[in-house]
Amino acid sequence: MRFYIKTFGCQMNENDSEAMAGLLVKEGFTPASSPEEADVVIINTCAVRRKSEEKAYSELGQVLKLKKKKKIVVGVAGCVAEKEREKFLEKGADFVLGTRAVPRVTEAVKKALEGEKVALFEDHLDEYTHELPRIRTSRHHAWVTIIHGCDRFCTYCIVPYTRGRERSRPMADILEEVKKLAEQGYREVTFLGQNVDAYGKDLKDGSSLAKLLEEASKIEGIERIWFLTSYPTDFSDELIEVIAKNPKVAKSVHLPVQSGSNRILKLMNRRYTKEEYLALLEKIRSKVPEVAISSDIIVGFPTETEEDFMETVDLVEKAQFERLNLAIYSPREGTVAWKYYKDDVPYEEKVRRMQFLMNLQKRINRKLNERYRGKTVRIIVEAQAKNGLFYGRDIRNKIIAFEGEDWMIGRFADVKVEKITAGPLYGKVVWVEKTPSPVSSSE
């Protein structure tokens, strides 16, 4: 039998989908390239924003139409599944899988194939180990979830309610997974967590993200290590030192700020001020001068005034982010903001504010990217884009596109930058590593 998984949302969802695929293949199922070719269709959903949730419902609607034409089993997983639970069974799905029940996907599928309606929401994170099979989407880079859940409870965020409280994987188990990846030819890993900086605190055995990075960097074959996503008040001096001194740890930090207004930050329950955030950036840059810092900002949070917004503009100008992800505030049912704050900023004003910041960030990007003009940069070749060009990232997470060939994927290459934009850079390959490229994409 064949299965198809459609994934929405964050990298952790991608990693969960890789695990579900691995478990199904282990049980004899075969991946399909589209829902039309599949006997089992799983929609792995995201609830972080209203738009992402709407996309998942739209996909479900299309699959349920297909179900009327052919016999298929339909499952819903991810954060919307955790939030809406059995409601999906009422809508026509055959099984629903909670965020901590991913290791039980084959149980759900088998029961659904026998005609049962299945809802699994038990906590099975203890089965989320290095032994869990995965079908990975890259030949050289792997996602590795190191901590599940979040304890921060920002007032706008649904994640603590859908992903649960923080729980770290034992360091030894994570390192076993990384060793296994290195043996299979993987060269890059990204450690994932909703609040990745909190890794180890709940283990109470001295584990920390900084120590994990150090230990993982000792594994032969692993060339680069990334981590996502950081929370400002958990970003330790120890972590900064590791980024500064360890050549395998990426000089790239994603540090969401969400707003530049202290009043709004307090309403968001972000637990820091604009001044404290900027001071943290200064501390990181003083130790890691080459670091690239990116961030997230929400515009139009309840009661956000023009004055609040201009505080955010001021922060963006001072922070000089390499990348900035912008989102329009959308109320998430069940959150504190949804319950207590009126969504009172007009949508048109939210759009205007987002567009203003987008234009500002483009100017900043263009200016920062000028530093690359004429330089030769070492990247790991990732893939071929739709426009036919190949691309890769340097250790600062800068994307560089170039004319290449498929055999280059997964290898180091030196690219001389010839063209600058506000987004990717463009260049010419001057050297490519001659060692064999990794070919395995499954475990």
UniProtKB/Swiss-Prot annotation:
SMART domains: Elp3 (SM00729). Changing C157A: Decreased iron content and loss of activity. One of its GO terms (molecular function) is metal ion binding. [4Fe-4S] cluster 1 binds at C10, C46, C79. PROSITE patterns: MTTASE_N, MTTASE_RADICAL, RADICAL_SAM, TRAM. Its EC number is 2.8.4.3. Its cofactor is [4Fe-4S] cluster. Its main location: cytoplasm. Monomer. Belongs to the methylthiotransferase family. MiaB subfamily. This is tRNA-2-methylthio-N(6)-dimethylallyladenosine synthase. The lineage of its organism: Bacteria, Thermotogati, Thermotogota, Thermotogae, Thermotogales.
